[in-house]
């Protein structure tokens, strides 16, 4: 389907056809798809034609959402990204007590014990650039998806990173400022009520965090070369600035 996607972006003027790529012919050549001719021996490139399934691929002139699939949410817990593209509209707003964890492993252990079988917002903190290098948190979605399928209203809040792994579960990710260094997530406690709303751009808690001390970060994991990158973690910028030590040192 990539040929169709590139083609519709070019048709709507949302991409430049003449940019140079690793392939001959510029970006426009990516709007064609490979195949074989009738005898099955010769590679040919052809126009992909219209979408074969409008539930999966649509032209840019008739998008799934006219205003895109990302939302900025912000409030007393900081600023975060909410990927709304695969989340049902009735789940754009979640308000529930939270459970606070410092690792993916702890979340899945609590899920296995049945401790998350309720309406809950799972907070996974100390996953930001300076805490542990902001790894991909791909192990969270299966458990949260199961809880959602059981009828519970669940969501995720984290200063960690996810790409497309959030899927159908409401998730406020890349939260900044991160918990390490005293960000708001470090002051949350179990059962604090959190509200996430992609429609209004809200990420807040009813708890008064002003008088609380931030939780201590867990000791960093060691081995597999992590020690070599400690200096980069210590000097990294926040997620909104690129989460990069090199860019930070260059003042970019």
Model-derived regions: residue spans:
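Catalytic or ion-coupling anion/metal-binding cores of large enzyme and transporter domains
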Residues: 1-153, 157-178, 183-252
């Amino acid at each position: 389907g990539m040929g169709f996607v590139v083609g519709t972006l070019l048709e709507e003027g949302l991409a430049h056809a003449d940019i140079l790529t690793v392939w001959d012919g510029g970006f426009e050549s990516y709007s064609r798809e490979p195949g074989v001719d009738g005898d099955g021996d010769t590679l040919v490139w052809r126009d992909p034609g219209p979408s074969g399934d409008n539930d999966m691929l649509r032209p840019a002139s008739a998008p799934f959402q006219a205003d895109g699939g990302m939302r900025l949410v912000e409030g007393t817990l900081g600023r975060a990204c909410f990927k709304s593209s695969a989340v049902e509209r009735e789940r754009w707003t979640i308000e529930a007590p939270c459970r606070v964890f410092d690792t993916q492993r702890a979340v899945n252990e609590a899920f296995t014990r049945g401790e998350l079988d309720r309406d809950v917002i799972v907070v996974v903190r100390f996953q930001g650039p300076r805490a542990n290098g902001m790894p991909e948190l791909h192990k969270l979605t299966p458990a949260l998806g199961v809880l959602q399928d059981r009828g519970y209203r669940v969501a995720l809040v984290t200063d960690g990173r996810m790409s497309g792994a959030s899927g159908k579960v409401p998730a406020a990710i890349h939260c900044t400022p991160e918990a390490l260094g005293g960000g708001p997530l470090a002051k949350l406690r179990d059962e604090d009520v959190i509200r996430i709303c992609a429609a209004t751009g809200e990420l807040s808690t009813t708890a008064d965090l002003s008088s609380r001390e931030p939780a201590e970060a867990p000791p960093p994991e060691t081995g597999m070369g992590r020690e070599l990158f400690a200096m980069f973690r210590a000097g990294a910028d926040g997620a909104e600035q690129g989460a990069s030590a090199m860019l930070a040192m260059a003042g970019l």
